[in-house]
């Protein structure tokens, strides 16, 4: 079978080693004669899987002991509702930083529960899209919390600053950048991430929440979104997505075996440098994000002649480079190069790009 590299933004590529283990264990897990998908989430065997996955996740991000880790349903969009329902309390507003598509989506959902103070952080620097430094964000004094998205998958924009807002409760959607670089978890009240990019398959959402923020949910908050209920029940208030949880655990083990988050950080920088280098050294390709705010996870790029887009996608697919079509909102191309994408995959893409330019430029 020819080598295929999947550049999908999510559900995304999983590590080959993880898929191999899952395949080997699929029909007979740990000698039980059944699949891990078939055993009770309350069995001692699955409890062991769940506890080990949480511990490995804590180790990878060095999560302080005063934070709870929740394995949830609902995806990132579910957390758009969970945040105000759990954190608003008796306040009526929260600060929402708009840096792109997903941050704006969080604002739209939040309006069902509060009146957001929207901070438009989008700016232009030398004709390229960028984000205001955090020091220029105008937070309000009466906000229940501040929310932002550190990495915008569609726009290819990253916010790399570490938040330092005093006593403000900082919440963040880390869906597309979790585990790709070190995070100072202590700077946040809530971190959440859909699993389908850097953690595992779709269907699982991880939430890291500071313990002092528990117990404040609105009376109308659905139990499946209530952080306290989930914490008190070890994320098993209802049946969790057990297979996704198991696979996430395999990914965490793979990360630890391969040097952890620090090693991923270095490799991800190498991959991004290689791809952006080809784009920047060409008049055939372009990226319209300022260097300081370029995403290392999602690299959108345009061809100078858009009439070649269809051919580029056809030829790249035939070459084993899949899912390079850009999001419908921005068009063009997009290469998502999460942790599971090896450097060899990015090298294969850049070699193809150089050759395509030679033939059609």
Swiss-Prot record:
Binds 1 pyridoxal phosphate per subunit. Pyridoxal 5'-phosphate binds at residues 76-77, 102, 153, 173, 196, 238-239. Its main location: cytoplasm. L-glutamate binds at residues 9, 42. One of its GO terms (molecular function) is pyridoxal phosphate binding. Pathway: Amino-acid biosynthesis; L-serine biosynthesis; L-serine from 3-phospho-D-glycerate: step 2/3; Cofactor biosynthesis; pyridoxine 5'-phosphate biosynthesis; pyridoxine 5'-phosphate from D-erythrose 4-phosphate: step 3/5. InterPro entries: Aminotrans_V_dom, Aminotrans_V_PyrdxlP_BS, Pser_aminoTfrase, PyrdxlP-dep_Trfase, PyrdxlP-dep_Trfase_major, PyrdxlP-dep_Trfase_small. GO terms for biological process: L-serine biosynthetic process; pyridoxine biosynthetic process. Its EC number is 2.6.1.52. GO terms for cellular component: cytoplasm. Catalyzes the reversible conversion of 3-phosphohydroxypyruvate to phosphoserine and of 3-hydroxy-2-oxo-4-phosphonooxybutanoate to phosphohydroxythreonine. Homodimer. Belongs to the class-V pyridoxal-phosphate-dependent aminotransferase family. SerC subfamily. This is Phosphoserine aminotransferase.
């Amino acid at each position: 079978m020819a080598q295929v590299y999947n550049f999908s933004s999510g559900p995304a590529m999983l590590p080959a080693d993880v898929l191999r283990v899952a395949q080997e264990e699929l029909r007979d897990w740990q000698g039980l004669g059944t699949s891990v998908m078939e055993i009770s989430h309350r069995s001692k065997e699955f409890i062991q899987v769940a506890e080990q996955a949480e511990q490995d996740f804590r180790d990878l991000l060095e999560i302080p002991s005063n934070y709870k880790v929740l394995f949830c349903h609902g995806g990132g969009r579910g957390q758009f509702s969970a945040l105000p329902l759990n954190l608003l309390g008796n306040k009526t507003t929260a600060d929402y930083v708009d840096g792109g598509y997903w941050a704006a989506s969080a604002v739209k959902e939040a309006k069902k529960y509060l009146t957001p103070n929207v901070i438009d952080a989008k700016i232009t620097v030398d004709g390229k899209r960028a984000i205001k430094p955090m020091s220029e964000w105008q937070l309000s004094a009466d906000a229940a919390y501040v929310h932002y998205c550190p990495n915008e998958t569609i726009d290819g924009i990253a916010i790399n600053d570490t938040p330092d807002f005093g006593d403000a409760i900082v919440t963040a959607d880390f869906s597309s950048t979790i585990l790709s670089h070190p995070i100072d978890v202590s700077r946040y009240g809530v971190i959440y991430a859909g699993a389908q990019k850097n953690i595992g398959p779709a269907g699982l959402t991880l939430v890291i929440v500071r313990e002092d923020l528990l117990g404040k949910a609105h009376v109308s908050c659905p139990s499946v979104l209530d952080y306290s209920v989930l914490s008190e029940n070890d994320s098993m208030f209802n049946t969790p997505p057990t297979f996704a949880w198991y696979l996430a655990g395999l990914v965490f083990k793979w990360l630890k075996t391969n040097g952890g988050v620090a090693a991923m950080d270095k490799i991800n920088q190498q991959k991004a440098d290689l791809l952006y280098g080809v784009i920047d050294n060409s008049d055939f390709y372009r990226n319209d994000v300022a260097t300081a705010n370029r995403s290392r996870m999602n690299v959108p790029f345009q061809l100078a002649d858009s009439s070649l887009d269809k051919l580029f996608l056809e030829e790249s697919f035939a070459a084993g480079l899949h899912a390079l079509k850009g999001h419908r909102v921005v068009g063009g191309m997009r290469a998502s190069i999460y942790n599971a994408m090896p450097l060899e995959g990015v090298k294969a893409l850049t070699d193809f790009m150089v050759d395509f330019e030679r033939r059609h430029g």
